[in-house]
């Protein structure tokens, strides 16, 4: 039995019961559920101004100090944003350490290069390697959505944030975001 299986909340509110108080006080139980809950959610990254003119990369942690997944916002020439893994697919080195302007993404460990879409481009001394590159050599792309100028990212979101955004827009449409 999984650690989380012992907790059940009936989806019918008439039959639902409150979780035991130990659930809220036990650090290990919190650690067991935090990734299950938050890795499946959308998180606010920032305002689009974090990528000003002459800046096309912005490294960040998914939930800094909580779920530390190194991610990278990348802005293309048309101002479109993508969220990519900021971890090299070769030796798990961080690729971009500071926001800035780059023409491609280069891992400083072994020189592996990726384009701004995260596609593998090259690696020194691997030109003659058989069955290389493979699809898994490219950087993983994560879901990204905007609410006006605000950027949200999800690792593996289990709901569509557009449903949330539509309700927010209903309430704040007068703000002209």
Give the label of every model feature segment.
Residues 1-80, 101, 115-177:
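Rieske [2Fe-2S] iron-sulfur-binding subdomain
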Residues 75, 85-87:
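Residue-level signal for short segments within beta-strands and strand-turn junctions
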Residues 82-85, 104:
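Residues immediately within or flanking Cys/His clusters that coordinate Zn2+
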Residues 88, 107:
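Short cysteine-rich clusters marking metal-coordination/redox-active sites
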Residues 91:
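Active-site gating/metal-coordination segments in enzymes
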Residues 94-97, 114-116:
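Short, non-ligating residues that shape and space the ligands of small metal-coordination modules
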């Amino acid at each position: 039995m999984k650690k989380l299986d012992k907790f059940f909340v009936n989806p019918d509110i008439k039959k639902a019961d409150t979780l035991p108080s130990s659930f809220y006080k036990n650090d290990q139980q919190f650690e067991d559920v935090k990734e299950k809950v938050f890795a499946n959610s959308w998180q606010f990254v920032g305002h689009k101004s974090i990528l000003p003119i002459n800046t096309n990369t912005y490294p960040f942690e998914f939930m800094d100090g909580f779920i530390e997944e190194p991610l990278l916002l990348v802005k293309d020439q048309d101002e479109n944003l993508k969220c990519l893994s900021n971890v090299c697919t070769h030796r798990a080195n961080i690729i971009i350490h500071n926001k800035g302007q780059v023409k491609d993404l280069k891992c400083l460990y072994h020189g592996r290069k990726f384009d701004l879409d995260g596609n593998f481009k090259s690696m020194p001394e691997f030109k003659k390697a058989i069955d290389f590159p493979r699809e898994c050599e490219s950087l993983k792309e994560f879901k990204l959505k905007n609410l006006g100028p605000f950027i949200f990212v999800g690792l593996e979101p289990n709901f569509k944030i557009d449903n949330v955004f539509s309700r927010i827009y209903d309430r704040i449409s007068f703000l002209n975001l």
